[in-house]
Regions:
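Localized edge beta-strand/strand-to-loop motifs within extracellular or lumenal beta-rich domains
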Residues: 381-395, 614-628
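Short, aromatic/His-centered strand-loop micro-motif at the edge of beta-sheets
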Residues: 362-384, 589-617, 662
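Short, conserved beta-strand segments of beta-strand-rich sandwich/propeller modules, principally
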Residues: 118-122, 224-228, 323, 384, ...
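Extracellular glycan-recognition modules
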Residues: 252-255, 305-362, 395, 448-454, ...
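Flexible glycan-contacting loops in extracellular carbohydrate-active proteins
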Residues: 357-361, 408-438, 641-672
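Extracytoplasmic low-complexity segments
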Residues: 61-68, 85, 211-219, 224-226, ...
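Extracellular beta-strand elements of beta-rich domains used
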Residues: 326, 385, 439-444, 450, ...
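Low-complexity, disordered linker/stalk regions enriched in Pro/Thr/Ser/Gly
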Residues: 8-13, 17-256, 286-312, 323
Length: 699
């Protein structure tokens, strides 16, 4: 019995002896130490800080010595030291609270640390039973910082291209780069924080501490401008702000421009600026101009060796920034053709035109060995082309109909001091890639043409085709406001007139209430069964850009079927229709894939909208330049679809019904007002003015 007790006692005593003794925390690693947000600085390059910094260290305690469910806790012991002005070493210490192993510990050093003095620090871990080695022992290193309590001085700002107004009041100009040098007298400045109007703040580094920094700026608009700058020193301190003002003129005119609107029979093209261009015998003056551009005529080139115009002199130095642009309408797209180029040795210095690749024809701008391509040329269709080389960035871009296409590329132009060409490009022997088609208004700028200018150059101003205010009707027709063709009203259509204000229902119980018109004094009321209005023929050319606007209100309390408000047919089916579909609670733009009997319809754009008798303003904008069609609701909400080429419409514009099975259907039950039609695509900013009851000019 006694022996058994002894054995049990010995077994109990042996349990704790098998547990591991406490292991000391691990030595902190330099890569786990930070001064503020900067890594530990070792050696002779301390971190500069603008205030007494917060130091941090991630500390670890081994887990091998843990008891079951024991938390692995550790605290940090920080120590900082420096030599004061009397040569005496000063030290400050701090012990943190305990925290879990692997988490950072912090110490914000006291405010009595001296400025402009190297302060060193190290740290060790403590688990209340043992401490680690200091972080600078063995292979470790001490960290160091310098507290900088003085901000840098304000910088001066200068620019050779854009002097201040007291020197030159207005300076040329939009599309011309300016270079601004910022320089602070402080020797520890490492960067400059700067801001131009309309742009976010940016940082420009210096090449060496205390040096200047030069930035470039491309004005995109004219008017008064400013540059605000602060110097930033190595501690992160900012100087007071310096402001530099300058005034930017509008972009200067082209260095060369040929309107190409000379009279038929001319043998040369007059230059508005630059050198006149002599024409080959394959050039015909007096051709048609793209509508809505202000151009009155163009030239036709027959694609032969005689179809060209040349100045016999360069138009610009293509080693500097330049842009070349013009209107072009190809008579074919199956081969390479050049709109404009400038001769270099054995080839063109640049070439703007049409190129054929594996995916088919595309517009192209080539300069040196670089080419950017995009867009889809179509036979017989006008396009505005602009090729741009930006010497500041060394990049080339291509714009088609005011929109950038393709991907900009790095380009290195060769010297091209040869003649400027319209309709051909230099080859190894003679000329090649001759243009077959029409060309108009060719321009060459010796600067960057900025995006807003590109858009304006390519803009084709819409033309009002008709506005039907639907205020009244005589003999079943409602007039167009400018005396154009009226709309014919069907049996279930009538003009509702709002109150004439001859009496006031709120004051006179015998005065009947008359609902107000949607817009103005009247609107078209449709019964949803036979009611409609129609023009005598197609109002918009659906193969070109167009805009339609209308104001509507659904009055059917039980919407159980689609209802069409606008449609225009081809030979066999509606080329487009705008309708409300209650099953999807959306306004829809519907188009067929083909103009064939029974062709399936496709909803190309739709906008969700729960309808409860509200007035709605709808618009359809087809932009042939971008191959898109857009449905707008209330001037702002939109849905856009790609439309490579619209089907041709031959049927009359219908208000309130759509074609169905050889007859009519989808009759609209509600009110319609302010039908407006334009040739050309209204800009998005113009669409909200549709349906307001005024003759809007998208000028």
């Amino acid at each position: 019995m006694v022996a058994g007790c002894v054995v049990a006692l010995l077994a109990t005593a042996a349990g704790p002896a098998q547990a591991l003794d406490n292991l000391p925390p691990k030595q902190p690693l330099v890569q786990d130490l930070r001064t503020e947000n900067s890594p530990c600085a070792t050696g002779d390059d301390p971190t500069y800080v603008s205030q007494p910094p917060r130091l941090s260290a991630v500390l670890y305690d081994p887990e091998e010595d843990n008891q079951p469910v024991e938390a692995n806790l550790v605290k940090g012991e920080f120590e900082a030291w420096w030599t004061d002005g009397a040569g005496v070493e000063q030290r400050r210490t701090h012990t943190t609270l305990v925290s879990l192993s692997g988490t950072p510990r912090y110490w914000t050093v006291p405010d009595d640390i001296p400025a402009n003095t190297v302060v060193s620090w190290h740290v060790r871990a403590d688990d209340d039973e043992a401490t680690s080695s200091w972080s600078d022992e063995g292979d470790g290193s001490a960290c160091s910082f310098v507290y900088d309590d003085v901000s840098p001085e304000k910088p001066t700002i200068s620019s050779p291209e854009y002097p201040e107004p007291e020197d030159v009041f207005w300076v040329d100009g939009v599309g011309v780069y300016g270079h601004f040098t910022m320089d602070s007298p402080s020797e520890d400045v490492v960067s400059y924080r700067y801001e131009f109007p309309g742009s976010p703040p940016r940082t420009a580094p210096v090449e060496q501490p205390g040096g200047p920094a030069t930035i470039s700026y491309l004005p995109l608009t004219s008017g008064p401008k400013w540059l605000r700058v602060r110097a930033v020193d190595r501690s992160g301190r900012w100087s007071a702000e310096s402001e530099y003002e300058f005034n930017v003129q509008s972009g200067r005119a082209p260095v060369a421009r040929w309107r190409l609107d000379d009279p038929a029979g001319s043998r040369s093209a007059t230059a508005e600026t630059g050198t006149a261009a002599r024409a080959g015998t394959g050039v015909t003056f007096g051709g048609p101009a793209p509508s809505g551009t202000g151009a009155t005529a163009t030239v036709g080139l027959d694609g032969s060796g005689h179809g060209f115009l040349t100045t016999d002199a360069p138009a610009t130095d293509i080693r500097k920034s330049f842009a070349v642009s013009g209107w072009a309408r190809p008579a074919e797209t199956g081969r390479n053709m050049t709109v404009a180029s400038q001769d270099a040795d054995g080839g063109p210095g640049f070439a703007l035109g049409l190129r054929n690749g594996e995916t088919g024809p595309a517009w192209s701008f080539a300069i040196g060995d670089a080419t950017v391509s995009g867009g889809a040329p179509e036979t017989g269709e006008w396009a505005h082309l602009l090729g741009l080389y930006d010497a500041e960035t060394g990049r080339a871009r291509l714009y088609v109909n005011g929109h950038e296409v393709g991907t900009e590329v790095a380009a290195t132009p060769a010297e091209a001091a040869g003649a400027f060409q319209i309709g051909r490009a230099r080859g190894a022997v003679g000329y090649r890639d001759r243009w077959h088609g029409d060309i108009g208004d060719v321009r060459v700028h010796d600067r960057v043409v900025v995006p807003d200018e590109v858009t304006e150059l390519a803009r084709r101003k819409p033309k009002l085709l008709g506005r039907w205010a639907l205020e009244n009707a005589t003999d079943g027709t409602s007039p167009e406001q400018s005396g154009g063709a009226p709309l014919r009203l069907g049996a279930g259509a009538s003009i509702h007139r709002g109150s004439d204000d001859s009496c006031i229902p709120e004051l006179d119980p015998d005065c009947p209430y008359v609902p107000p018109a949607l817009v103005g004094n009247g609107h078209l009321a449709l019964d949803g069964e036979t009611g409609y209005a129609a023009a005598d023929g197609p109002v918009v050319d659906t193969t070109e850009s167009f805009t339609l606007g209308v104001v509507v209100r659904l009055t059917d309390s039980a919407l159980d079927r689609p209802m069409t408000v606008l449609s225009q047919a081809g030979e066999h089916t509606d080329v487009f229709k705008v309708r409300y579909d209650p099953s999807t609670h959306s306004w829809q733009l519907v188009m067929p894939e083909k103009d064939e009997a029974g062709a399936p319809e496709k909803v190309v754009a739709q906008i969700k909208s729960a309808e409860g008798g509200q007035k709605r303003r709808l618009a359809v904008v087809q932009d042939d330049g971008t191959d898109t069609i857009t449905l707008f609701l209330d001037g702002s909400v939109k849905a856009t679809a790609s439309l490579p080429r619209g089907l041709r419409s031959t049927g009359a514009l219908q208000i309130g019904r759509a074609g169905a099975g050889g007859g009519w259907g989808e009759y609209f039950h509600g009110d319609v007002d302010e039908v407006q039609a334009y040739s050309g695509a209204l800009r998005e900013r113009d669409v909200p003015f549709l349906g307001t009851g005024v003759d809007y000019c998208p000028c």
